[in-house]
Design a protein with these regions (language model features):
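Active-site beta->alpha loop and helix N-cap motifs at the rims of alpha/beta catalytic domains
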Residues: 1-161, 244, 250-253, 260, ...
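Residue-level detection of beta-strand scaffold positions
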Residues: 47, 176-178
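Catalytic-face loop-and-helix region of soluble metabolic enzyme cores
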Residues: 203-272
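Short, hinge-like loop/turn segments at secondary-structure boundaries
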Residues: 106-108, 195-197, 227-230
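Conserved anion-binding
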Residues: 116-154, 158-164, 172, 179-180, ...
Length: 285
């Protein structure tokens, strides 16, 4: 079954594994992909989610130095060929005009055989970008009959009126969303509840939301997540740092606890928003 069909079947669980393209020092694409293949053979994964890494000036100094990496669509095609699992390629759409952006997307679909894309906006609303907004890009993709693409978007649960943004993106062609990394359940519970209410009012079906989790193993990982804008409660951060020797274990425990709290709320309140998991590999960032 194609990822597109899995995403659109509300009762079917969907799990994505998010990993960065390899750095130059990680060796060849083939050897890196083979390592990933060995890792993923031990579990069930529906898709490999590949982010696009860019320097983000507005966030301040990056706690972990950015390094030159392979192009996401090239890495995605190789993984599809070697691992046999569909790739989702993230694309920041704001940095070139709509014509150039659509050319890139068409090439990604036809030449690299990528059928799943997450459209990503700019890092700051205060910056004027030369390219389209996420909704403009989604609309252009949906109007292009030559494309065979499943489009998704990013969700930031702590952002004001985020449920309204999900509706707008859905109306422009987004069929699923991946959230920012979660270390607390309150904002995502609030967002999903509001999203369900808005969908009911509009008599439309909610799109799938992939809940993102990124277990950490060091204080450097925590600093990087916070630089990305991830909200980690102070109590949770203290618990992780004070138990640095078993941070990975503690982090996994927190992740499971947050997920169970979300699932319990959805079940108790009969919320029908289909969810899934997006597990991020933070160790090599």
């Amino acid at each position: 079954m194609r990822l597109k069909d899995k995403i659109k079947r509300p009762r079917r669980p969907v799990v994505a594994y998010e990993i960065l393209p390899p750095r130059e020092k990680d060796g060849t694409l083939n050897s890196y992909a083979s390592n990933i293949s060995s890792l993923l053979s031990q579990t069930h994964i529906d898709a490999i989610n590949i982010p696009e890494v860019r320097d983000e000036v507005a966030r301040g100094e990056r706690p972990i130095k950015n390094q030159i990496r392979a192009e996401p669509r090239e890495f995605g095609k190789l993984l599809q060929d070697i691992v046999g699992i569909e790739a989702i390629v993230n694309r920041v759409v704001v940095h070139q005009n709509i014509e150039q952006e659509m050319k890139w997307i068409e090439e990604t679909n036809s030449k690299y055989e990528i059928e799943n894309i997450i459209t990503v906006g700019g890092e700051s609303r205060e910056i004027r970008y030369p390219g389209p907004t996420v909704n403009q890009a989604l609309h252009a993709i949906s109007q292009n009959d030559s494309l065979n693409l499943l489009c998704g978007g990013i969700s930031i649960p702590s952002r004001d009126r985020e449920s309204k943004r999900l509706i707008e993106k859905s109306e422009n062609g987004s069929e699923f969303f991946t959230t920012q990394v979660l270390y607390d359940a309150s904002n995502i519970i609030k967002m999903i509840t509001h999203y369900q209410k808005r969908c009911d009012e509009k008599n439309t079906f909610p799109r799938r939301v992939l809940l993102s989790f990124a277990p950490v193993s060091s204080e450097k990982n925590i600093k990087f997540l916070k630089w990305l804008g991830v909200e980690i409660p102070k109590k949770t951060e203290r618990l992780l740092i004070e138990n640095s020797a078993i941070m990975s274990e503690k982090s996994m425990g927190i992740t499971v606890s947050v997920l169970n709290e979300i699932l319990s709320h959805l079940d108790k309140n009969k919320i029908k928003v289909p969810i899934g998991l997006n597990v991020e590999h933070i160790m090599s960032y």
